[in-house]
Amino acid sequence: MIQAAKYIGAGLATIGVSGAGVGIGLIFSNLISGTSRNPSVRPHLFSMAILGFALTEATGLFCLMLAFLIIYAA
């Protein structure tokens, strides 16, 4: 019974990973849109997009780490 609850909790914790995937897609789609509108600001937009990517990916990895902790922690 406890093992089943761990698997359910880990599955729910991985929902954040899908949110991170959507967030990364939005970041880079807006980067492409902004670069096509004004190519001269590409370096600034790219650095901001990489920062947003890193923060979004960190959130997704945190959710994945939490899922592994739920499953394998004693």
UniProtKB/Swiss-Prot annotation:
Keywords: CF(0), Hydrogen ion transport, Ion transport, Lipid-binding, Membrane, Mitochondrion, Transmembrane, Transmembrane helix, Transport. The chain crosses the membrane at residues 8-28, 50-70. GO terms for molecular function: lipid binding; proton transmembrane transporter activity. GO terms for biological process: proton motive force-driven ATP synthesis; proton motive force-driven mitochondrial ATP synthesis. Coiled coil: none annotated. Pfam families: ATP-synt_C (PF00137). The keyword tRNA processing does not apply. InterPro entries: ATP_synth_F0_csu (IPR000454), ATP_synth_F0_csu_DDCD_BS (IPR020537), ATP_synth_F0_csu_sf (IPR038662), ATPase_proteolipid_c-like_dom (IPR002379), F/V-ATP_Csub_sf (IPR035921). It is a multi-pass membrane protein. It is found in: Mitochondrion membrane. PROSITE patterns: ATPASE_C (PS00605). One of its GO terms (cellular component) is proton-transporting ATP synthase complex. Its main location: mitochondrion. The record marks 57 as: Reversibly protonated during proton transport. NCBIfam families: PRK07558.1. Mitochondrial membrane ATP synthase (F(1)F(0) ATP synthase or Complex V) produces ATP from ADP in the presence of a proton gradient across the membrane which is generated by electron transport complexes of the respiratory chain. F-type ATPases consist of two structural domains, F(1) - containing the extramembraneous catalytic core and F(0) - containing the membrane proton channel, linked together by a central stalk and a peripheral stalk. During catalysis, ATP synthesis in the catalytic domain of F(1) is coupled via a rotary mechanism of the central stalk subunits to proton translocation. HAMAP family: ATP_synth_c_bact. Belongs to the ATPase C chain family. PANTHER family: ATP SYNTHASE LIPID-BINDING PROTEIN, MITOCHONDRIAL, ATPASE PROTEIN 9. F-type ATPases have 2 components, CF(1) - the catalytic core - and CF(0) - the membrane proton channel. CF(1) has five subunits: alpha(3), beta(3), gamma(1), delta(1), epsilon(1). CF(0) has three main subunits: a, b and c. This is ATP synthase subunit 9, mitochondrial. It comes from Schizosaccharomyces pombe (strain 972 / ATCC 24843).
